[in-house]
């Protein structure tokens, strides 16, 4: 993507904030509400299956968020194959309409058959993405940090790709920076790092690398003080983006004095 300070553009929508936030795992809806405010986010993910099933922590979720201010990103969490993900994506679009977002065709596509490490299925993701793009969805697929899959998803019309930093909820940070750097370098669509980020400095690292945004859930929701951590991630995301735009000092194997040596008083 071009090195610019314009808004984050996904599909035909523009957003000031580059921090996307999940809505799961909070101790209460009140903590979630206050945390979302502190993140200054404009996009939140909602697990369609969990909201519909009124699972613990999701009852009352739809009524707890100001959908006039925040854009809903329905996700297909819990889907293990392409067919299931396509069906849930369609339900997600209806959920967004119920929230008053009639033109919202966004979907965070997750196809995860692996229950231990929660790694996405590249073949199922590609299959589901292709169909959803045909149906007019703005598709944001969650993927492994595989440059080839990222490029294929871009070519079929996905609005962004969301490579994982490390497994979901693991707080291991960005373990595959080289692959993610390749994806960023070769992409013409926004890259949003999703999963594995545990602390604000890792969010800053992602933005400094040139990623267009980050999606955070567990690192905020499960922090000792989620509301304060939300604020920290907001600041880190802004700092990381500014650092990227500023152009970092290049690494050098040799030292370089901060003060010039010309004119230094000698002992002679």
UniProtKB/Swiss-Prot annotation:
Which species is the source of this protein? Prochlorococcus marinus (strain NATL2A)
GO BP annotations of the record are: thiamine diphosphate biosynthetic process
Q: What is this protein called?
A: Thiazole synthase
Q: Where is the composition biased (Polar residues)?
A: 255-268
* Entry's Gene Ontology molecular function annotations: thiazole synthase activity
The pathway entry for this protein reads as: Cofactor biosynthesis; thiamine diphosphate biosynthesis
Which InterPro entries does the protein's record reference? Answer: Aldolase_TIM (IPR013785), Thiazole_synthase_ThiG (IPR033983), ThiG (IPR008867)
Gene3D superfamilies for this protein: Aldolase class I
**EC number(s) given by UniProt:** 2.8.1.10
Give residues annotated as binding 1-deoxy-D-xylulose 5-phosphate: 169, 195-196, 217-218
The lineage is: Bacteria, Bacillati, Cyanobacteriota, Cyanophyceae, Synechococcales
């Amino acid at each position: 993507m071009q090195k610019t300070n314009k808004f984050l553009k996904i599909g035909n929508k523009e957003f000031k904030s580059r921090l996307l936030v999940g809505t799961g795992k909070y101790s209460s809806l009140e903590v979630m509400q206050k945390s979302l405010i502190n993140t200054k986010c404009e996009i939140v993910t909602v697990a369609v299956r969990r909201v519909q099933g009124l699972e613990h922590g999701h009852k009352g979720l739809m009524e707890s968020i100001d959908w006039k201010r925040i854009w809903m990103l329905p996700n297909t969490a819990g889907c293990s194959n392409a067919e299931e993900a396509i069906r849930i994506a369609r339900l997600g679009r209806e959920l967004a309409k119920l929230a008053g977002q009639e033109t919202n065709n966004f979907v965070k596509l997750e196809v995860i058959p692996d229950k231990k490490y929660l790694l996405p299925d590249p073949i199922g993701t590609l299959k589901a993405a292709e169909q959803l793009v045909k149906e007019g969805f703005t598709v944001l697929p969650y993927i492994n940090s595989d440059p080839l899959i990222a490029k294929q998803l871009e070519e079929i019309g996905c609005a962004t790709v969301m490579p994982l930093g490390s497994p979901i909820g693991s707080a291991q940070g960005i373990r595959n920076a080289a692959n993610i750097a390749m994806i960023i370098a070769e992409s013409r669509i926004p890259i949003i790092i999703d999963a594995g980020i545990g602390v604000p400095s890792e969010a800053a690292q992602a933005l400094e690398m040139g990623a267009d945004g980050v999606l955070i859930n567990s690192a905020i929701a499960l922090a000792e003080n989620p509301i304060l951590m939300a604020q920290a991630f907001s600041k880190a995301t802004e700092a990381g983006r500014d650092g990227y735009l500023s152009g970092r000092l290049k690494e050098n194997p040799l030292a370089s004095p901060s003060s010039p040596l010309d004119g230094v008083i000698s002992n002679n």
